[in-house]
Amino acid sequence: MATLLKGAEVAKALTASLQGEVAALAERGVTPGLAILRVGARDDDLSYERGAMKRCEKVGIAVRQVVLPEDVTQEQLLGEIEKLNADPAIHGVLMFRPLPKHLNDAEARAALLPAKDMDGITDGSMTAVYAGTDAGYPPCTAAACVALLKHYNVPIRGKRVVVIGRSLVIGKPVSMLLLAEHATVTICHSRSQNLPEICKEADILVVAAGKAGMVGAESVRPGQIVLDVGIHANPDGTLCGDTRFAEVEPVVEAITPVPGGVGTVTTSILASHVVAAAKKTLE
């Protein structure tokens, strides 16, 4: 049986570390502040918002909810973003996407200051991730993958990593983050030829294809570390990932469960970005 790389342990350790950093900031008169900007009330947004607020409360981050109606105009949305950009009490902004179809997503992202972009949605943040600078923050889920590997002391340097998925949210940024850790990274996707054979060559396999049960026993071998980033609802209401867990788990060395794996770490990464942004105001 594989070792389960549970996210709760990682989140707990990150939270404890952040609490110390927040206490140090308080001594200098700074309280980290996060604004959660949400348009409408999508169920998945509300679920993540609850988790983020709970995590921030544990850490000591002040959270402000900015909730706009589903029919908000582009001008109203941009106005709220500008207010948050200018507010010194707000060190970071989490803007839920996708936005309703009548809104211009690219324009909204461009309006947000990269320094306050906590989830890597602006072009400035993406540039920082690809350039390897600390001028922005990567998407929380991508950063959670790396944090999880480091917490469990999984060697990354020099290792062969295969990432299935090429999205700007996970696939591409996690590849860049792992490359910065000196891994040898191959990016694959649903149209890659000989995908199972490529996957078997990996020491670390990151599955972020967004397709339930895409990877099974045919794509893994003993000794591998598997990070399953997907999360999907089965017809019976249970959750599953991008791997067929029952097939993969008996073969590999370690795997993240779904639920309870990578996703459990994301709100702690969000909190770490807010704290880092608050610390930069003292530089």
How should each PLM-predicted stretch be described?
Residues 76-88:
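Short, well-structured alpha-helical segments in soluble
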Residues 106-126, 230-282:
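Rossmann-fold NAD(P)-binding glycine/threonine-rich loop
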Residues 96, 208-209, 229:
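Short, well-ordered coil/turn residues at beta-beta hairpins
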Residues 56-70, 185-187:
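Short beta-strand elements in bilobed, periplasmic/extracellular small-molecule ligand-binding domains
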Residues 1-30:
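Positively charged, low-complexity intrinsically disordered leader regions
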Residues 31-40:
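Short beta-strand segments enriched in small/hydrophobic residues
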Residues 91-156, 161:
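Anion-binding alpha/beta catalytic cores of soluble intermediary-metabolism enzymes, centered on
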Residues 39-53, 136-225, 234, 238-249:
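Glycine-rich phosphate/diphosphate-binding loop of Rossmann-like nucleotide-binding domains
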